[in-house]
Amino acid sequence: MTFLFFGPVVGFSQDLCDFPADELGKKFPQAGMETMSSKYQEIRDSMPSMSDMTDKQMSLVMKSMGGDYYWPHSINEADNAPGLLILAHGFGEEGDADLYNSMEDFSEIYQTTIAYGMSMMSSRHIECSLLEMDQAGDGKTYIVPVSASPFNTLVRQWRYIFNLEDDYSYANVERVNSQRAVFLEPIGDHPLVREIVLDFANEISSDPSNEVVLIVAHGPVSGEDNALQLEMMENISSYLSANGRFLEVMPLTLQDDAPPEVRAANVQRMREFVSSRSYNGRDVLIVSNLMSGKGIQRRVERDLEGLTYTFNSNGVATHALFREWIKVSIQESLGKSQMD
């Protein structure tokens, strides 16, 4: 499902986007500290896990996440070239570069930019990337949320920025309106992500009849969202069972940003699954629908220390079929707009 927005890109001054790129072409909009500090209480109110933090602690957390930024590919000089704005959480320097490089071919057709960051306290990196696209062409801009599920605070914050949600997830950042923007749904349990996860399992499989597969996801904060994501992941699990002929397939969410006791309970379930199947002589394969191969995989390995399993740590977003999913989603949005 897609959404169109009408009206010019508004809500910020063009002067705020007048800053140089670094040597790689990354652009880091800067927001004043007075703006940042005013958001802390909103985040405390929105995020129970951060409710007791002081301003200083909050500042340290934000710095540890790294700044929001955007990274445009070379400008497509074709007249009326459409835009492609890819929104990603951010996966560290190496993971960000992997995603950026994997999307290079799109720049032959689209004005292509990846905007990295959680947009917790600012949307300026999104605003400025849209402004550049508006200046470079006048076709539609397709907004791609890089997320395994729509059921999480990050996707809702992005949707809030594009006026698709009434309430923010973190803080009240600037909202944008663009006559060009078409917001695509996250990949979720789309048939192509089922194929991607099956590929990951097959890459480490040798005897499916004696193998069990655990599909590990980052997971959302709330229990309600978690139930919805697990229901979605059951469709991926069923696909692997039917097409991979594995003995058993189970989805599991870590809820990595939830309160420690919630995550710990999920880790315990994960350890019990791996240890019990190994004890019964089964080979345990672990895959994920994580967007990046540079995400929480190391924490998963620490969580499973001392157990026997095989882990394919690859991420979905750099798989060739993820790019195919973007193409399919754009075509579906075009078909829908023609019917409307």
Regions found by a protein language model. Name each.
Residues 1-8:
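Bacterial N-terminal signal peptides
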Residues 9-13:
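Sec/Tat signal peptide C-region and signal peptidase I cleavage site
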Residues 14-340:
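Active-site-proximal alpha-helix that buttresses catalytic centers in soluble enzyme cores
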